[in-house]
Amino acid sequence: MRLTASEIAAQFGLTVVGDGATEVSGVATLAHAGTGQLSFLANPRYRPQLAETQASVVILRADDAESAQGTALVAKDPYTAFAKIAALFDVAPVRAPGIHASAVIDPTATVSPTAHVGPFVSIGAGSRVGDGCVIGAGSIIGEDCVVDDGCELIARVTLVTRVRLGKRVRVHPGAVLGADGFGLAMDAGHWIKVPQLGGVVIGDDCEIGANTCIDRGALEDTVLEEDVRVDNLVQIAHNCRIGAHSAIAGCTGIAGSAKIGRYCLLGGHVGVVGHLEICDKVVITGKSVVRNSIHEPGEYSSGTPLTDNRTWRKNAARFKQLDALARRILAVGKENQ
């Protein structure tokens, strides 16, 4: 595919600075782009690369346009504009409708004639696969699941039981949705398993990363509202609810019955304690541990920032002395009263 800068600008509401007839046929970073490729400048730290890039077209903000060496496309948000334009060059393979001969489908399951069911797929009793879905190789859809129109299970995805995917949900390889939640009760020194009778409900336009696990609820469903984006290797425990348009980065763990609001961002390796609530528009930075509910929007952090080993050891030793030091300060204060 080849597009001119003017064609791209017209399609996405951008302003051309330079030669609108400049053609691009692909995308790349500023540092590695060459002739015929489009790049973008969103982070100021990469501004020095603008003078050296070989990209034919660069998406940038208006105040950077004069520094562009070639044709520029001016956007209010260059990164978002780049994401939309790059999608034009991301040509997905065409999946022809039909069911592979090796797939095993229960007689009570229903599969749309426009769906693609790949090799070694299993679809259980009472489940339904909607129009235009792609069920990739080795995926397992258990009993009583719904995969609504336009969904894609890329490969080796497991929907255990009572999982409902909304429209246009994308699930990456190795993800497991609808496994038992971690519900246990102690009785006479032995664990008793608490039956997990709920399900998992995923809203429209969600994306679930590779090897992520979302457990089904004990009594009520585990719910991801619409347009939630979950990275790889995330654990979402039973009965959690994730608000619409939130994003969760890799290796994050969310304990049972936690409620996270709309438009929240959780960085990598965040831990969220169970049975708490996080309000809308909260940002939790990477490696933080959320131990209490959050009722005010904003950015929150915890954890120990990286420093050199010698300084860290000194600080750790002093941290152990904080209680004794606090007691001494209190004692001095009382003596001076």
Swiss-Prot record:
Organism field: Xanthomonas campestris pv. campestris (strain ATCC 33913 / DSM 3586 / NCPPB 528 / LMG 568 / P 25)
One Gene Ontology CC term in the entry: membrane
Catalytic reaction annotation: a UDP-3-O-[(3R)-3-hydroxyacyl]-alpha-D-glucosamine + a (3R)-hydroxyacyl-[ACP] = a UDP-2-N,3-O-bis[(3R)-3-hydroxyacyl]-alpha-D-glucosamine + holo-[ACP] + H(+)
UniProt subunit comment: Homotrimer.
EC id: 2.3.1.191
Enzyme's top EC category: transferase
GO molecular function: N-acyltransferase activity
UniProt keyword annotation of Cell division present: no
CDD domains noted in UniProt: LbH_LpxD
Residues at the catalytic site: 238 (proton acceptor)
Family under the similarity heading: Belongs to the transferase hexapeptide repeat family. LpxD subfamily.
Name listed for the protein in its UniProt record: UDP-3-O-acylglucosamine N-acyltransferase
Swiss-Prot/TrEMBL GO biological process terms: lipid A biosynthetic process
